[in-house]
Amino acid sequence: MAAPAPAFTAPFPPSAAPVVVDPPASSVPAFLRPLEAAYLRFEAARDRLGLADPGKYEDLGREVKLTHLTNYTFDGARADLSKTLSQVPAFQVTHSFAAGGAAGPMGGVNPGTYNFGAVYATSKTFMQGMVDNEGSVTGRFNYGWSPRDTTKMSVQLAASAAAPSMFSLEHDRVGKDYTASLKAYNPSPADLTGSYIGAYLQSLTPHFAVGVEALYQRQGEVEDCSLGYIAKWHDVKKDEAGAALKDSWIATAQVMAQGMWQATYWKKLAPSIDAGVDLLCVPALSPRDRKAVATAGVKYDFRTATFRGQVDSTGKVSALLEQRLSPAFAFTVAGEIDHIKNTSKFGVGVAIDSASEEAMAAAMNAGPQAPPPI
């Protein structure tokens, strides 16, 4: 009797047999499908390059601004008293006092100013408001629709007619290898007056990006339109915490739509030392109106202090030291000498930050939170 033929089984049990799924039908009309196929091939080629987004237009030269003390220096006496009322969501109020500076009326000594501010922030919303002793009000509102899309609004209401009020609306889009932004200052839908700025940056290589800026202004019957161009070179390596490592650098060059030229260079010299250089040129037909200012600065980060030093081509030498004596108390000293005008400025300030017991308890029990859309 012949042996029975061997039995063969399928390579997969019936429940695990592979299922062939037809690709989804394209919703594009037939006559546009060649364009769709070309676009998909183009997107696949972009993905293979592995390019990262070049950063937002408004952040060009941000590292240099953080290194220099132009946005931090002051003169006279200043005190900031802050209290954190909540950690999740973040809610903080601040009382700011200033006196003795050179920003007083008619160029005299400032007799004293007071500002009250409040900040509220979540992972999707950021709100900030401030009012001073003269009644001027400023406010900001940011909303993050997604990690890649953010809408921003700001308003400034001046107490006196001499200072103009302002309203701005902005939207930022961060793509895989590009960034785009649209901004409008004092827009009027009725007659389309106002200032409108559009910017686009595109990464071409992992270390190089180019962009364009368009400016359109309309005030009454006067219209103006101009273009600007941007280039950015960078080689930034970061640690696990997101901080830049030694020898990281960023260089930018910009021909602004307003006609000015600007170039910046920033480098991480050491884990606690940053250096930055900025060159700003204002071309003009008349040699008397042509201006150029070069600024070089350095920042040292110590365990409980930060020192900034700066010198520029106009003869100004300035320095700022912020000493944090405790987590809730900081002492700041700022000074500037203008060798050309033979003038000097000096400032001293304190900052006190406190938190309620409820806020501290909530912070200890809360998990990691996403940063607000600033």
Q: What kind of region is each of these model predictions?
A:
Residues A199-D301:
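Detector for outer-membrane/organellar transmembrane beta-barrel domains
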Residues A2-N186, A351-D353:
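Transmembrane beta-barrel domains of Gram-negative outer membranes and organellar outer membranes
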Residues F116-Y120, G139-Y143, L169-R173, G198-Q202, ...:
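Residues on the lipid-exposed face of transmembrane beta-strands in outer-membrane beta-barrel proteins
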Residues N110-Y114, N133-V137, A163-F167, K176, ...:
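Residues that define the transmembrane beta-barrel architecture of outer-membrane proteins
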Residues F97-G101, T122, N133-G135, W145-P147, ...:
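Transmembrane beta-strands of outer-membrane beta-barrel pores
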Residues G104-M106, M127-G129, F141, A159, ...:
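Outer-membrane beta-barrel proteins
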Residues K124-M127, R148-M153, G175-L182, P206-V212, ...:
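Repeated loop/turn-to-beta-strand initiation elements of outer-membrane beta-barrel proteins
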Residues Y229-W233, A294-V298, A319, K341-I374:
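Outer-membrane beta-barrel "beta-signal"
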